[in-house]
């Protein structure tokens, strides 16, 4: 990987690690007494479809609308509509900032327009980060994601295991371990959060 190298974990470099990855490696090193290397791709606020390929999303009728809807919206950005959409976003953001200063409770932040350049788009991280590191030999994966899919729990139940299967196939190392974190409770009134926690349970049992 260009301009990238292994770094020894020290008090100076430790803050660069994702917390889950750091403590996982620390405990593994303690148990095995061997060097533990971590290739981390820490990107917060992502959906599971950002980590899957276009081929996978198009292969299933339940996933296909994700990529088709995104392509339709992104094409509109390229056809001269983006400036109008972005202007609306800026105005909404200004109103959000004003209301946030006046109120203590959470106010929904407007969603920034997401064109084809945005790495958080569907398939975005699969086409960038994953493609760069997939040649590396691994002992397994650790994965912490799901908050951004809480409103689509039923779809996540099917797409997440499909993503796991695709990752294993991409690395070509057989049924290597895939460990993931069940989402903790979060200070929110939405019913979707607990739903996604429950949905992850069958996946955990199958793995």
Residue spans of the language-model regions?
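Metal/cofactor- and membrane transport-associated sequence elements
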Residues: 1-137, 178
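Secondary-structure transition/capping motifs at alpha-helix termini
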Residues: 30-34, 166-176, 204
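Short glycine/threonine-rich loop-to-helix capping motif typified by GTGT followed
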Residues: 55, 151-156, 186-194
């Amino acid at each position: 990987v260009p301009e990238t190298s292994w770094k020894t974990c020290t008090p100076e470099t430790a803050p660069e690690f994702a917390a889950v990855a750091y403590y996982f490696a620390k405990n593994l090193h303690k148990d095995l007494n061997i060097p533990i290397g971590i290739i981390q791709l820490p990107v917060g606020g992502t959906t599971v479809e950002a980590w899957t390929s276009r081929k996978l999303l198009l292969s299933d009728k339940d996933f296909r609308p994700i990529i088709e809807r995104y392509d339709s919206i992104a094409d509109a950005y390229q056809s001269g509509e983006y400036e109008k959409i972005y202007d609306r976003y800026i105005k909404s953001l200004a109103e959000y900032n004003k209301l946030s200063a006046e109120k203590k409770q959470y106010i929904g932040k407007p969603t920034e327009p997401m064109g084809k350049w945005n790495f958080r788009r569907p398939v975005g991280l699969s086409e960038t980060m994953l493609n760069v590191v997939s040649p590396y030999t691994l002992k397994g994966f650790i994965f912490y994601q799901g908050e951004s899919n809480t409103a689509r729990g039923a779809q996540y139940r099917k797409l997440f295991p499909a993503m796991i299967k695709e990752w294993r196939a991409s690395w070509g190392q057989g049924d290597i371990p895939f460990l993931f974190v069940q989402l903790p409770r979060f200070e929110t009134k939405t019913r979707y959060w607990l739903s996604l926690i429950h949905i992850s349970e069958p996946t955990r049992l199958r793995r």
